[in-house]
UniProtKB/Swiss-Prot annotation:
One of its GO terms (molecular function) is ATP binding. Residues 208-400 form the GMPS ATP-PPase domain. The active site is at 86 (nucleophile), 181, 183. This is GMP synthase [glutamine-hydrolyzing]. It comes from Klebsiella pneumoniae (strain 342). Residues 9-207 form the Glutamine amidotransferase type-1 domain. Homodimer. Its EC number is 6.3.5.2. The gene is guaA.
Length: 525
């Protein structure tokens, strides 16, 4: 038996903050398993989960409103440490007898909090000292309401000029509340505070490490599928690749991967996938040449949403046909990751935890009665990448920029044709190659080329030619919800443009997209 890596676990109750998933990722980075649940859980669910500690997240609502969310009362009766963050602190204060008021002054941004009383949460943690030797912490505030009276059995640990209770604590019960966000990097000692809570106060061991996660996943796969055969749609993306490697380690030749080349992949990508997973790692792969079938289905279609649906539908058809050719396959594997699971479980009060399977592959044929294997469903994307490295996948592949599921189908604007895809593949490869050469690839979050179905006049030698236009796109973002266009050097852009126009016959003009998100989206379609 492998070690029980879920033995120590933190429960995070989500009150709707944009940072809640970040809290969970930080706890995982500390080597401790945690789960994110909607705030409206029942006592029975908490008892069954049996957490070592509970974190109450921030949230956009006001505790002063009558129907705003509250933590289940059992949270404060379970006998485990509780850590309230921002809204979580406010609801803790209100529920335990303190008082919260709306404030005219919204506190948003950097603040310095002064530690005025000793607490296990911040003992020995400081950014600087006041003139009389009191610890100061640089933190990130984002709140309107504030606690104006703490419960009678709590003490004030830290305050700012306009936030008298920036940290409150009941050391005996191990209840702590902070009015700032320890999970964001702007709170410089935030990770140390979370570590203090999770590792010291809750006494969780760091069992959640890539090597142990792999051992646990392999054992669970073997227990689930036994000697049965499993099929997986391998795309060459991060999630399906790591899923393939885990399954291969667990069940070897009982895994069959189906790789569908839809003609909408990057330059030489199909060959790279076959070389790496087939030749190098020795996986059992069925390679389906599907380019013509996808292009035929897309013929004459200009609408982006319709193109996505067609590509998805044809993929499912092809995958199903291949699955039916295989004898006795009992299980379908998918690269579902934890954010997919959270998304599908979004709280509808009372039905918070009906977690639907998040189908990447779409509907399977009625005649195929298959179970579902999802070895990554507990993991965040950054954890999936770390596991991939541990399993021997190359860094460049795991940390490559995101590529849309429909591939070039949504980077060729309007109707998709083979000619357009071939031109775009070559132009995009030049852009990416130059980014690597200039050491800029890892400085931008995503970079790609878009094919515009418009002809523009160009000059070649003594002649004029009407050829196609491509746009380069590069953005910087933390979460892909908002993004800035990347200010790439002019001489770099000039070099890329010259190479594309000179080396890709059929392109006469290169433009650079300087739109942010919002108002534009990152992808053009």
């Amino acid at each position: 038996m492998t070690e029980n890596i879920h033995k120590h676990r933190i429960l995070i109750l989500d009150f709707g903050s944009q940072y809640t998933q970040l809290v969970a990722r930080r706890v995982r980075e500390l080597g401790v398993y945690c789960e994110l649940w909607a705030w409206d859980v029942t006592e029975a669910q908490i008892r069954e989960f049996n957490p070592s500690g509970i974190i109450l997240s921030g949230g956009p609502e006001s505790t002063t409103e009558e129907n705003s969310p509250r933590a289940p009362q059992y949270v404060f009766e379970a006998g485990v440490p509780v850590f309230g963050v921002c809204y979580g602190m406010q609801t803790m204060a209100m529920q335990l007898g303190g008082h919260v008021e709306g404030s005219n002054e919204r506190e948003f941004g950097y603040a310095q909090v002064e530690v005025v009383n000793d607490s296990a949460l911040v003992r020995g943690i400081e950014d600087s000292l006041t003139a009389d030797g009191k610890p100061l912490l640089d933190v990130w505030m984002s709140h309107g309401d504030k606690v104006t009276a703490i419960p009678s059995d709590f003490v004030t640990v830290a305050s700012t000029d306009n936030c008298p209770f920036a940290i409150m604590a009941n050391e005996e019960k191990r209840f702590y509340g902070v009015q700032f966000h320890p999970e964001v990097t702007h709170t410089r000692q935030g990770m140390r505070m979370l570590e203090r809570f999770v590792r010291d106060i809750c006494q969780c061991e760091a069992l959640w490490t890539p090597a142990k996660i792999i051992d646990d996943a392999v054992e669970r796969i073997r227990q689930q599928v036994g000697d049965d055969k499993v099929i997986l749609g391998l795309s060459g993306g991060v999630d399906s690749s790591v899923t393939a490697m885990l399954l291969h380690r667990a069940i070897g030749k009982n895994l069959t991967c189906v790789f569908v080349d839809n003609g909408l992949l990057r330059l030489n990508e199909a060959q790279q996938v076959m070389d790496m997973f087939g030749d190098h790692f020795g996986l059992n792969i069925v390679h389906v040449e599907g380019e013509q079938r996808f292009l035929d289905a897309l013929k004459g279609e200009n609408d982006p949403e319709a193109k996505r649906k067609i590509i998805g539908r044809v993929f499912v058809e092809v995958f199903d046909e291949e699955a039916l050719k295989l004898d006795d396959v009992k299980w379908l594997a998918q690269g579902t990751i934890y954010p997919d699971v959270i998304e599908s479980a979004a709280s509808a009060t009372g039905k918070a935890h009906v977690i639907k399977s998040h189908h990447n592959v779409g509907g399977l044929p009625k005649e195929m009665k298959m179970g579902l294997v999802e070895p990554l469903r507990e993991l965040f994307k950054d954890e999936v990448r770390k596991i991939g490295l541990e399993l021997g996948l190359p860094y460049d592949m795991l940390y490559r920029h995101p590529f849309p599921g429909p591939g070039l189908g949504v980077r060729v604007l309007g109707e998709v044709k083979k000619e357009y895809c071939d031109l775009l593949r070559r132009a995009d490869a030049i852009f990416i190659e130059e980014l690597h050469k200039a050491d800029l690839y890892n400085k931008v979050s995503q970079a790609f080329t878009v094919f515009l179905p418009v002809r523009s006049v160009g000059v070649m030698g003594d002649g004029r030619k009407y050829d196609w236009v491509v746009s380069l796109r590069a953005v910087e973002t933390i979460d892909f919800m908002t993004a800035h266009w990347a200010h790439l050097p002019y001489d770099f852009l000039g070099r890329v443009s010259n190479r594309i126009i000179n080396e890709v016959n059929g392109i006469s003009r290169v433009v650079y997209d300087i739109s942010g998100k919002p108002p534009a989206t990152i992808e053009w379609e």
